[in-house]
Amino acid sequence: MDRCPADAITLNPDHAPQLHTSACTGCTGCVPACPADAIEHEAVSAVSLLQQARQLVMQGQSEINVACNAVTDTHPGLSVHCHASWNPAVLASMAAEGVRILHLEGIDQCNGCPAHHGSSLMQQTEKDYATLNKSLGIQLHISHKAKEIVVEKPLPVAEPEPQRRAFFRSLIPTLTQGAAMAASQIGQAVNQATALEIPEADTEHDSHLPVRLQLFLRALPRLQANFTPMPFMPSLPLGAIQANARCTACNQCVEQCPTKALDIREFGANKILEFQPDACIGCRQCINTCPEDALESLPGISLPSVLTQRARPLIMVHEDMLKKEPDRSDRPELKEDD
């Protein structure tokens, strides 16, 4: 709801999002905003966009033009429904693929476009991406101008050559064609080997994460993450929590976590509450449901801790603090006549 600039999304009495089509402009800005991938649009696919970007980079293009639907005469490159559909996770993933400059063609035409909100929503996305880049070494630059088309100048007319030199030069097209064919075959093999598929769950946690976040986590090892804490951003839902001594290992947070980021394991007579950094989306359900107020969210997250992909202990709950089951031994047994 906060992402929609047209106020076209509200919550119904069951607390489920409801779209008011009369107010919706179709900018698709809500699609990347949902941390659960609950909102979809056929024209928005992070996987398809990254796949196309990878192909262009493999062809030697690190400077890519992306046109929206407002552009009628587009330059060669990629296309999106509206520039409102961008999010920091996809931008970072494109940087990991080798994209260095992203030209957003048509972003200056939003006022006359039915979608209308591409430019305003992209401004917030760029701010979030700039914040994310403080924690990354590899990043791309965003341009609001279309990529310039370089017109190759015609080659000067060559002077007549000696007969022997002309013979060997005549072999060049044949050799070039053979090399191009070999390169094409190699390229096709590489493309097939590196084709970007919809992420399959590597772990139990991955299956509960939004696709764009899975793509970002897979790109993260190539982005040179540093230890600058990244604040929580709804556009890139990565969260972190900590526990205090009031924890009784009651298991309610584990049961409520939609991404299985929390778990409790036994350690002798004690129990340990564990946290999986790469599975938390910062939804705060665990915090809101904790009966002891033993959990709180951290203001930032360290991306290298996410790279470890290992659960870390939050707190050890000693035996005397464990939530006990009600003792029914002293209750009188009910007789059938009762």
Regions from the language model: what does each represent?
Residues 1-3, 61-69, 73, 149-260, ...:
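Ferredoxin-type iron-sulfur electron-transfer modules and their immediate structural context
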Residues 29-152, 285-338:
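Flanking helices and flexible, charged tails adjoining ferredoxin-like Fe-S electron-transfer domains
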Residues 14, 263-277, 302-305, 310:
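Ferredoxin-type iron-sulfur electron-transfer modules in oxidoreductases and energy-metabolism complexes
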Residues 11-17, 226-241, 266-268, 272:
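Short Cys/His-rich Zn2+-coordinating modules
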Residues 1-7, 18-37, 242-260, 274-293:
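Cysteine-centered iron-sulfur cluster-binding motifs in ferredoxin-type domains/subunits
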Residues 99, 256-266:
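A contiguous binding-surface segment within folded domains or other stable secondary-structure elements
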